[in-house]
């Protein structure tokens, strides 16, 4: 499909002939020129899926969305043990993981159209004060004692965590964001500032941001009024233990409060945390549904530790089999088929002699997760894999769910590894504790369990049918602990 047809298919009769003429005679040649120059960057590295012609990469991009696993597998066989554009072999993971010249935030902002209305959330990742990273590392991790509460309770407090309008936004915004981002990426970068106005998914993002402002802003104003009243009365300032308060504190401490948008911050938390946490929880349930013989040992571990120690962070840490089962599900189905997304901010020469030019984009291949040289029988789900690894000398730390390394980059690797992984890991454990103790489940016969891979992103199957029922008798009353 040509660029012209792509635009008109979205815009239909709304696109006036005047704008069509401008588009055809000015933007199309401009887009072709810049798309071709972009392809030629870093051409010393072989291109795994070259375009069919000079007149755009739309067909190639759409093909990659549907066939990314196949294209990646072909590239591995064509270029064994060497980089191919723009995905490096995993041998370079440790070398590049903490290099400050390789920017994760710039790569994320470029991929997800920072600066285009509706995509404001991705710009938060690139803030110089690292606001969202600080809140994730310092505050979410510190407040694991209330992990049994759902994410919205921690993020927004008790006033909004049950707000149906907000919960709807948190569920739909992430889906709409990635759909809009993927569809907009089908267009050459040079015309995306125009194309987004005609994409229905982008319109949804702009509307959801407007709706979120209407929900969150009144709450923030009420809190500020309470603080002003407390100051006037000479009383202590009220404290709210949620991400709204934490983010404002961090922004003020960094001296960036004036540029801080609390609504965008909340949408970004939802974007970065909720869907990934849900996906790993769902994949773990699917894997255990396929292997129900492992459910009872996990249940026994949970019941024993909670009965002896109650709900504490140390209790969750001691659930080593549960930790291993989740990490094994992440190994078999990571959230992305590649990891360590980076943008090169200045020329870099790797130890192999390969030079990465400024402006180059790269990712690291995630194939070590199913490499038989690293893991025995990698195609087999074994929830004891990392549990047993903990007893091996020098491997205890690396076998933990939250640990990162070049052999398991489910949460990334290096200084840009997921800052909220400690929070997410414990949130998933608490959810599974409740599910294991209170419910039995199994997969429906012949249900589909194959992951849904779109481009780089791999999601747990959205069509898997799970039969679940409440257990008639339970070993422990979790609410009474």
Curated annotation (Swiss-Prot):
Pathway: Plant hormone biosynthesis; gibberellin biosynthesis. Keywords: Heme, Iron, Membrane, Metal-binding, Monooxygenase, Oxidoreductase, Transmembrane, Transmembrane helix. One of its GO terms (cellular component) is membrane. It is a single-pass membrane protein. Induction: Expression is induced under gibberellin-producing conditions. Expression is repressed by high amounts of nitrogen but is not affected by the presence of biosynthetically advanced GAs. Its main location: membrane. GO terms for biological process: gibberellin biosynthetic process; secondary metabolic process. Heme binds at residue 418. GO terms for molecular function: heme binding; iron ion binding; monooxygenase activity; oxidoreductase activity, acting on paired donors, with incorporation or reduction of molecular oxygen. Its cofactor is heme. Gibberellin 20-oxidase; part of the gene cluster that mediates the biosynthesis of gibberellins (GAs), diterpenoids that may provide a selective advantage during infection of the preferred host plant, rice. Gibberellins (GAs) are diterpenoids and are synthesized via the mevalonate pathway. Biosynthesis of the major metabolite GA3 (gibberellic acid) from geranylgeranyl diphosphate (GGPP) requires 13 steps. Belongs to the cytochrome P450 family. PANTHER family: CYTOCHROME P450 (PTHR46206), CYTOCHROME P450 MONOOXYGENASE AUSG-RELATED (PTHR46206:SF2). This is Cytochrome P450 monooygenase 2. The gene is P450-2.
């Amino acid at each position: 499909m040509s660029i012209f047809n792509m635009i008109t298919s979205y815009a239909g009769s709304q696109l006036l002939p005047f704008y069509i003429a401008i588009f055809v005679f000015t933007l199309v040649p401009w887009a072709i020129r810049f798309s071709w120059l972009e392809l030629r960057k870093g051409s010393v590295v072989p291109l795994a899926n070259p375009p069919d012609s000079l007149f755009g990469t739309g067909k190639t991009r759409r093909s990659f969305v549907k066939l990314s696993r196949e294209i990646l597998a072909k590239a591995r066989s064509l270029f064994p043990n060497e980089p191919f554009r723009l995905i490096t072999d995993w041998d370079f993971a440790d070398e590049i993981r903490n290099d400050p010249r390789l920017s994760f935030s710039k790569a994320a902002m470029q991929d997800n159209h920072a600066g285009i209305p509706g995509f404001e959330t991705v710009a938060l990742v690139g803030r110089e004060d690292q606001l969202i990273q600080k809140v994730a590392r310092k505050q979410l991790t510190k407040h694991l004692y209330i992990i049994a509460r759902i994410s919205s309770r921690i993020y927004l407090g008790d006033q909004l965590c049950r707000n149906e309008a907000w919960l709807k936004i948190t569920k739909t915004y992430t889906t709409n964001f990635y759909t809009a981002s993927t569809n907009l990426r089908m267009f050459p970068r040079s015309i995306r500032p125009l194309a987004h106005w005609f994409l229905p998914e982008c319109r949804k993002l702009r509307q959801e941001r407007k709706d979120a402002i209407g929900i969150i802003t009144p709450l923030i104003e009420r809190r500020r009024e309470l603080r002003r009243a407390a100051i006037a009365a000479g009383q202590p300032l009220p404290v709210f233990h949620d991400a709204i308060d934490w983010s404002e504190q961090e922004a003020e401490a960094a001296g960036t409060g004036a540029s801080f948008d609390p609504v965008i911050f909340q949408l970004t938390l939802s974007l970065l945390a909720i869907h990934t946490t849900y996906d790993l929880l769902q994949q773990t349930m699917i894997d255990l549904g396929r292997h129900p013989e492992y459910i009872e040992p996990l249940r026994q571990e949970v019941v024993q530790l909670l009965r002896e120690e109650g709900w504490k962070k140390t209790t969750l840490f001691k659930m080593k089999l549960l930790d291993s089962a989740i990490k094994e599900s992440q190994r078999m189905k990571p959230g992305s088929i590649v990891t360590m997304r980076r943008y090169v901010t200045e020329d870099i020469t790797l130890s192999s002699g390969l030079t990465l030019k400024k402006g180059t984009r790269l990712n690291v291949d995630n194939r070590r997760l199913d490499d038989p040289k690293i893991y025995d029988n990698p195609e087999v789900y074994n929830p004891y894999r990392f549990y047993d690894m903990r007893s091996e000398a020098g491997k205890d730390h690396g076998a933990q769910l939250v640990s990162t390394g070049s052999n398991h980059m489910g949460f990334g690797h290096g200084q840009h590894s997921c800052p909220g992984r400690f929070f997410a890991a414990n949130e998933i454990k608490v959810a599974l504790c409740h599910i294991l103790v209170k419910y039995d489940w199994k997969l429906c016969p012949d249900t589909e369990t194959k992951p849904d891979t779109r481009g780089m992103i791999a999601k747990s199957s959205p069509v898997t049918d799970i039969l679940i029922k409440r257990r008639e008798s339970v070993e422990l009353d979790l609410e009474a602990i």
